[in-house]
Swiss-Prot record:
One of its GO terms (cellular component) is cytoplasm. Residues 252-383 form the GOLD domain. Signal peptide: none annotated. Residues 76-249 form the CRAL-TRIO domain. Disulfide bonds: none annotated. SMART domains: CRAL_TRIO_N, SEC14. CDD domains: SEC14 (cd00170). Gene3D superfamilies: CRAL-TRIO lipid binding domain (3.40.525.10), GOLD domain (2.60.120.680). It comes from the Eukaryota. This is SEC14-like protein 6. Pfam families: CRAL_TRIO (PF00650). It comes from Homo sapiens. InterPro entries: CRAL-TRIO_dom, CRAL-TRIO_dom_sf, CRAL/TRIO_N_dom, CRAL/TRIO_N_dom_sf, GOLD_dom, GOLD_dom_sf, SEC14/CRAL-TRIO_domain.
Length: 397
C-alpha cells in the first residue's frame, strides 16, 4: 500500500483515525485538516503515531513564529524581490506546479549584506506557501487532488562564491525547515546545467535532507532540455529550458514568472560584512609566519577559509608542499594562491580554492614584513569533499 488516500492498508487506516483523535485540540488551527494533509505527516514518520504527532505540533509552533497564516500578504524587501532568483512557472502532466531556483545567477553574499537571514528564509517559506496555494487551485481546476510540486535547480554559473559559508549555512537552514514543515510535497528535484562543483555543494547540504528527498534528486546531463520534456510538457516549459512557453512579449525566459537574480548593487547593502565566528586564534610574531596544513586526498576537493587579524594587516597565501612529512619554507613549495597582504584588521577575508591535485596544502599567514608588531589572527579552515555518487554520475555526462 502506498499510504495515500484510497490506498491504505487496514493498519494505516487505523493509524490515520488514531492520529486524528490524538490531535483533536489543534485540528481547527490546521490549514487543511483533511486526510490528505494528515497523511503527509504520517508518511514522513513512517506512520509512527508519536513521532508524527511531535512533528505536527512543532510545525504548529513554526506556523505561529513565522505567521504563515498571513505570509502571502507579506511583502519582502525590494532587494529580495528583485534578486532572490526563483519563481513558479508551468505545471507537469499531473498538474503539479513547477518551481524554479536559478542558483547559478544568485548573489548570496550580496543578499546577506542587504537583507537579514530571517527575511531571506521567510521569503523561501512564502514561496512554499505560494506553491501549496497553487496546488489547491490546481485541485479545484482539475477536479482531483494535486499535492506535490516539481523543483528545477538551474546551476549554470555555479562557482566558488556559491560555497561561501554563510550562504551555505542559509541553504542548510532552509532545507532543515523544509523537511520539518513541508513533508511529502516534493515530487522531484531536477538539477540542470550542473558543473562538477555541484558535487561539493550537494555534499554540504545533503545531511539536511531526508533520505527520501535525496532519492528524488535527478541530475540531467548535456541533453537536459530534451530530458526535461519527459517530466514537463514543452508548452509548460520556458523556451530557456527547452520548451515553447514565452512571456506575452515573447521573452524566452518568462521573466514575468521567474526571477533570474543577478549581482546585488552595493547601494542595497545594509552592512559591510557578515558577522562570522572563527574556530582558531593564534599569534603571528614579528618577522615570522604561521602555516596551517591540510591534507587533500583526491582532486576536486575544495579548501574554504575565513580569517580576520588584529593589530594590523596580515599576509596570506596558499602553497602545495613538494616534500611530505617535513616543514618547508615558502620558497620550497609550489605557490597555488599568490601571497599578498590583506587589511583583515578592517574587513575580514574569506576565500575558496578548488584543489586540482592531491597533496598537503599549506595556508600561510605571514608577518615577515613587520619588525616591530606581532599580529593576532582568528581563522577557520575547512576541506569540503564532493559527494562521490554525484561526482561519478556527472563524470559520465
Amino acid at each position: 500500500m502506498s499510504g495515500q488516500v484510497g490506498d491504505l492498508s487496514p493498519s494505516q487506516e487505523k493509524s490515520l483515525a488514531q492520529f486524528r483523535e490524538n490531535i483533536q485540540d489543534v485540528l481547527s488551527a490546521l490549514p487543511n485538516p483533511d486526510d490528505y494533509f494528515l497523511l503527509r505527516w504520517l508518511q514522513a514518520r513512517s506512520f509512527d503515531l508519536q513521532k508524527s504527532e511531535d512533528m505536527l505540533r512543532k510545525h504548529m509552533e513554526f506556523r505561529k513564529q513565522q505567521d504563515l497564516a498571513n505570509i502571502l500578504a507579506w511583502q519582502p524587501p525590494e532587494v529580495v524581490r528583485l534578486y532572490n532568483a526563483n519563481g513558479i512557472c508551468g505545471h507537469d502532466g499531473e498538474g503539479s506546479p513547477v518551481w524554479y531556483h536559478i542558483v547559478g545567477s544568485l548573489d548570496p553574499k550580496g543578499l546577506l549584506l542587504s537583507a537579514s537571514k530571517q527575511e531571506l528564509l521567510r521569503d523561501s517559506f512564502r514561496s512554499c506557501e505560494l506553491l501549496l496555494r497553487e496546488c489547491e487551485l490546481q485541485s479545484q481546476k482539475l477536479g482531483k487532488r494535486v499535492e506535490k510540486i516539481i523543483a528545477i535547480f538551474g546551476l549554470e554559473g555555479l562557482g566558488l562564491r556559491d560555497l561561501w559559508k554563510p550562504g551555505i549555512e542559509l541553504l542548510q537552514e532552509f532545507f532543515s525547515a523544509l523537511e520539518a514543515n513541508y513533508p511529502e510535497i516534493l515530487k522531484s528535484l531536477i538539477v540542470v546545467r550542473a558543473p562538477k562543483l555541484f558535487a561539493v555543494a550537494f555534499n554540504l547540504v545533503k545531511s539536511y535532507m531526508s533520505e527520501e528527498t535525496r532519492r528524488k534528486v535527478v541530475i540531467l546531463g548535456d541533453n537536459w532540455k530534451q530530458e526535461l520534456t519527459k517530466f514537463i510538457s514543452p508548452d509548460q516549459l520556458p523556451v530557456e529550458f527547452g520548451g515553447t512557453m514565452t512571456d506575452p512579449d515573447g521573452n524566452p525566459k518568462c521573466l514575468t514568472k521567474i526571477n533570474y537574480g543577478g549581482e546585488v548593487p552595493k547601494s542595497y547593502y545594509l552592512c559591510k560584512q557578515v558577522r562570522l565566528q572563527y574556530e582558531h586564534t593564534r599569534s603571528v610574531g614579528r618577522g615570522s609566519s604561521l602555516q596551517v596544513e591540510n591534507e587533500i586526498l583526491f582532486p576536486g576537493c575544495v579548501l574554504r577559509w575565513q580569517f580576520a587579524s588584529d593589530g594590523g594587516d596580515i599576509g596570506f597565501g596558499v602553497f602545495l608542499k613538494t616534500k611530505m612529512g617535513e616543514r618547508q619554507r615558502a620558497r620550497e613549495m609550489t605557490e597555488v594562491l599568490p601571497s599578498q597582504r590583506y587589511n583583515a584588521h578592517m574587513v575580514p577575508e574569506d576565500g575558496i580554492l578548488t584543489c586540482l591535485q592531491a597533496g598537503s596544502y599549506v595556508l600561510r599567514f605571514y608577518n615577515t614584513y613587520s619588525l616591530v608588531h606581532s599580529k593576532r589572527i582568528s581563522y577557520t579552515v575547512e576541506v569540503l569533499l564532493p559527494d562521490q555518487t554525484f561526482m561519478e554520475k556527472m563524470e559520465k555526462f
